[in-house]
């Protein structure tokens, strides 16, 4: 998705398009979807800000952050100069900074969550305790204390946005376990059974996946979902999303 696609949509329509991305990211990264959505709305002004439109950077992510050493980043190294407002000594000043450029909104969300989950401050996580934190006020305070934003009322603004649009409904609770299947080869087919043609084949050491590719179906997915459902009847939706 390109941020430009959101430019003229009403607020509810923006949430409808972005919320599934935030929820899926929540499953993978552990960053609450409510926090992702609220920051998306505030930092990109509903995806309409000039920076978001020009770069798909929907969270104000600057070029250099915490040594750029967190795992899972989707940033390719491309950046652009943009003038932004920063709070300094009680005043708001405008100054040029280098901001990250992304290929899509999805990449922006993934990099933002990877940063929140893995950025370091010395030997400690900068946002320690944020992953799977379902108390949104606690989560917002962790983000503020970690130095994400300079605005003194950032926590209040973030929480107000979450409450106004009931964004906690998109959160995913921490799963009790992770299913990981390691195999030498995976073939996703158009239906269950080897008589159906394969749509994609992945080979190599330590290939692991529960996958659905363009409507395809694989034995690993089928078996893993069935096994997972026996111990957790509500797990199918999460497994299908992987």
Across the structure, where does each feature detected by a protein language model lie?
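SH3/SH3-like beta-barrel superfamily modules
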Residues: 199-236, 240
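Cell-envelope/ECM-targeting effectors and their regulatory/trafficking segments
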Residues: 173-177, 182, 222, 239-242
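Catalytic cores of secreted/periplasmic lytic hydrolases that degrade extracellular macromolecules
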Residues: 1-178
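Hydrophobic residues in beta-strands and at strand termini
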Residues: 61, 181-182, 210, 220
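The feature marks long, low-complexity, polar/acidic/proline-rich intrinsically disordered regions embedded
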Residues: 193-195
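Core beta-strand residues in small-molecule sensory/regulatory alpha/beta domains
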Residues: 189-191
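Residue "hotspots" at secondary-structure boundaries inside conserved domains
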Residues: 100, 197-200
């Amino acid at each position: 998705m390109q941020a430009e696609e959101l430019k003229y949509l009403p607020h509810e329509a923006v949430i409808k398009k972005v919320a599934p991305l935030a929820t899926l990211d929540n499953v993978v990264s552990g960053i609450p979807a409510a926090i992702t959505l609220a920051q998306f709305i505030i930092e990109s002004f509903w995806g309409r800000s000039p920076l978001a439109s020009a770069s798909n950077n929907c969270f104000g992510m600057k070029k250099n952050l915490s040594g750029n050493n967190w795992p899972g980043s989707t940033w390719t190294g491309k950046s652009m100069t943009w003038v932004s407002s920063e709070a300094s000594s009680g005043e708001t000043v405008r100054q040029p900074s280098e901001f990250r450029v992304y290929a899509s909104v999805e990449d922006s969300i993934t990099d933002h969550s990877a940063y929140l989950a893995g950025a370091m401050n010395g030997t400690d996580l900068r946002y320690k305790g944020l992953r799977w934190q379902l108390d949104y006020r606690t989560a917002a305070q962790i983000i503020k204390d970690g130095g994400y934003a300079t605005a003194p009322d950032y926590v209040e603004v973030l929480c107000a946005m979450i409450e106004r649009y009931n964004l906690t409904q998109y959160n995913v609770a921490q799963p009790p376990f992770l299913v990981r299947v390691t195999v030498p080869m995976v073939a996703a087919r158009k239906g269950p059974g080897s008589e159906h043609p394969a749509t994609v084949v992945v080979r190599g050491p330590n290939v692991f996946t529960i996958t659905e590719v363009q409507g395809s179906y694989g034995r690993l997915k089928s078996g893993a979902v069935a096994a997972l459902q026996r111990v957790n009847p509500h797990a199918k939706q999460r497994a299908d999303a992987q």
